[in-house]
Regions:
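Short, proline-enriched alpha-helix->beta-strand connector loops that line the catalytic pocket
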Residues: 2, 102, 116-121, 144-146
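Serine-hydrolase catalytic machinery in alpha/beta-hydrolase-like enzymes
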Residues: 2-75
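Conserved alpha/beta-hydrolase "acid-adjacent" motif
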Residues: 15, 115, 130-136
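Gly/Ala-rich beta-loop-alpha elbow adjacent to hydrolase catalytic centers
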Residues: 82-92
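A conserved short beta-strand
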Residues: 99-111, 120
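Short beta-strand/loop motif that positions the catalytic acidic residue
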Residues: 123-125, 129
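Catalytic histidine-centered segment of alpha/beta-hydrolase-like enzymes
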Residues: 154-169
Length: 186
């Protein structure tokens, strides 16, 4: 049995392109069980405030913990975490704290994500992401041994405003995602 878990961001739910298409690719690769997490968080002022971001992380982590309590990850032969934004920190923390041997795909990770030393990871980030300092995240990814693909002038949704360019970026991200998913785990 194979499980895929989607960890959304606060404003980026599981039916938005990065998580939607990566989840479909996982299903095509034989992931027969899917869990889509949902969060509730309504406070403003997260950007530029490490304390507020940490508070949001703690709240979302507790919600994820509650939703994953019945998942019984060890029963699965292969576990894949797909995550976006603050969800990348939640997924990395959950894997670390529970010792789950999973693979993770991090879409637009935050610097906080790498505090949990995610393993078996692939990451994607835009250089114009207002939520992540691309230089800091790239340095943290490098120190963690995480392959990170950077997209020039792309924002937190990996978009630039040029629709055709954005579609090409999405296709590139999904091709890399598909290759990572298809690789033999662990």
């Amino acid at each position: 049995m194979k499980l895929v878990v989607c960890f959304p961001g606060i404003g980026y739910h599981c039916d938005k392109p990065l998580l939607y298409y990566s989840r479909k690719l996982a299903a095509c690769a034989g992931y027969d069980h899917t869990l889509l997490l949902q969060y509730t968080y309504h406070k403003d002022g997260l950007r530029g405030s490490p304390a507020a971001l940490r508070e949001a992380f703690d709240t979302l982590y507790a919600q994820a913990e509650a939703q994953l309590s019945a998942a019984d990850c060890p029963q699965y032969d292969d576990v894949l975490f797909l995550s976006k934004s603050i969800g990348t920190a939640v997924s990395a923390a959950f894997a670390q704290r529970h010792g789950i041997p999973c693979r993770q795909i991090l879409y637009t990770p935050l610097s906080l994500t790498f505090a949990f030393a995610p393993q078996n990871v692939l990451a994607f980030l835009g250089t114009a992401d207002p939520w992540s300092d691309a230089f800091s995240v790239a340095a943290a990814a490098r120190a963690n041994g995480t392959p990170l693909f950077l997209y020039e002038n792309a924002n937190h949704s990996l978009e630039t405003g040029d629709v055709l360019h954005d579609l090409a970026t999405l296709q590139d991200v999904m091709q890399k995602t598909q290759t990572f998913i298809a690789d033999t785990p662990h």
